[in-house]
Structures are given as structure tokens and as C-alpha cells.
Amino acid sequence: MGAKIKIGINGFGRIGRLVARVALKRDDVELVAVNDPFITTDYMTYMFKYDSVHGQWKNDELTVKDSNTLLFGQKPVTVFAHRNPEEIPWASTGADIIVESTGVFTDKDKAAAHLKGGAKKVIISAPSKDAPMFVVGVNENEYKPEFDIISNASCTTNCLAPLAKVINDRFGIVEGLMTTVHSITATQKTVDGPSSKDWRGGRAASFNIIPSSTGAAKAVGKVLPALNGKLTGMSFRVPTVDVSVVDLTVRLEKAATYDEIKAAIKEESEGKLKGILGYTEDDVVSTDFIGDTRSSIFDAKAGIALNDKFVKLVSWYDNELGYSTRVVDLIVHIAKQL
């Protein structure tokens, strides 16, 4: 194969560290640099090695060479600690594509600061109000080389969009509502605390079911224009640490039995969407999907039809690792046009 794609990561939080794990296990990408102003290299090593959800890193031994370098086995990764993205000298490390995973620089102008340091492309690991959004398996072929800043959308959009695409392509969606029952994330509080923009979101994450807003369903209309204005949704944050589940309730254009819908999803999961969309008829629960790298795993036993035009569909996702794997897939896709 050709030269590896050299990548950098800005923000070594949940997604940043998991993107690093995914990248380090692949032979088509090479992690060359990480920037995080809030953690030292020795603490970075600890946080990467030990993970409460995904377990201990058992691949290459991770050591600190010095305050600016980590060693994964013998492979050096440069570490920066700049608060301002335009100050990060990505070019000095050869990093071509940057994963912007701080959660702070999510619009085009802010993310474009990475280009000043020599990056060629930036992938935002969050929804963006103005950067083009891509969901692998759904619309990544709409990517054009002139797009320097793009978004990998959200974990929930990555779960919902492949499922919605199959249903809309086969049966047509008149309209629909989505609910995601979503694991807690780093923005939530361990005990009741201040959250002026979202009062409910400030309540203790570990023993509440917390209704919340999500733009994930509306964002499907951005990656699948045929569904624009046809879907919206909301979220319940629940006290699990990883894996979430989408409940998509839709009105169909074409009448279909639940068995026909299951067959269509199974066929796509074994065809064009293999590795992205999964299918199971097992009696699964959420922890069964920790570590699953697929974007969306349809639970055939959990869904239900009211009639042949009104149906509830259920699909699981590891909102951390599945999403992080798609970030790397998107890197590989856009690198073909560098």
C-alpha cells in the first residue's frame, strides 16, 4: 500500500483518545501529533492506557520519552500544549489531517485556525453549524477536495442516518420522530451543579433520567436532503457510561410488513452498508455493544409495527468507539483526494 496518512488530534478527551486507539490499530493511518493544553505527557499516558469503559490498552507499550514526545512502542508521537489552534505547528510533524475533538472549535472559522499551522484538512468530531457534514455509508461521496473543514456529524446522527436511508430508499418516509436513550457524557454533572443554559442538564447524571434536546434527527436532513424537514427528535440521558439506542418511529409512504422491513435492513447490512449498519435478532442489552465499531446495529426483536405504514425501529450504537471509528474512516476517504 501507499504511504500512511499522517494525522494529528486536537483535544485528548473521550473521542480524541479513542480516535488515537483506532488509528494506532490501523495500517493506513499514522498518528504523529496530539495537542492538549490541559494535560501533561505522563498524565496523557495514564489516561490513554487505562479506560474505565473500553479496558486497558494492550497493544504497543506506551512510554513518555520527554515532555514533548510519547512513544507507542518505538513510534514517536509529538505532544503540543497550545490553547490557540493557530499556534500549533502541525506542519513540523507532517500531520496532513487534523481531528478537532475539543468540542470547542466546531464552526468553520474556528476550526480553520489549524490550517495556519500547516494542516491540509480538518475533521470536526461534532456537529457543526456551517461546515459540511458527512456520515460514512450515507453521503461521504458528496465530499469535494475543496472542502478543507468538514464535520463527522454526531454519534447519534451516525446511528440514525444509515437506518433512515435504508427505510427511505426502500419504503419512503413521510415523517418521523426519533428518541435516543443516550449514555452520560463528559459535559454532565456527577452531582447537581450549575448549568445555566440547560437546567435539567445540571442535575446529577448518575441517578437521573434527564430529558434533553438533540439536533441529531434534524441533521439527518443535511446528510440526506430527501429527509429535510421530515425528522426531528429528542434525547433521554440515562445513567450508563457507554452505548446508546435510537428509537425511530416513522410513517411510511409504501405499505410494508415488519418482516419486509427487517429483510431490507438485513440485506443492506450484508451489502453496501456492511461494517456500518448491523443487524441482530438476539436478545441483546446495551453492554453487549461496548466496543462495537459499527455505527448502527438494528435490533429486529425490539421494533414493532402498529400497521403497515406506521412503525417503530430500534438501533444500538457504541456512541464512543463506533463514532471514533467513523472519524478514521472519513480521514481515509478524504485522504484519497489530497
Curated annotation (Swiss-Prot):
Pathway: Carbohydrate degradation; glycolysis; pyruvate from D-glyceraldehyde 3-phosphate: step 1/5. CDD domains: GAPDH_I_C, GAPDH_I_N. Keywords: Cytoplasm, Glycolysis, NAD, Oxidoreductase. Its EC number is 1.2.1.12. NCBIfam families: GAPDH-I (TIGR01534). Plants contain two types of GAPDH: cytosolic forms which participate in glycolysis and chloroplast forms which participate in photosynthesis. All the forms are encoded by distinct genes. This is Glyceraldehyde-3-phosphate dehydrogenase, cytosolic. It comes from Pisum sativum (Garden pea).
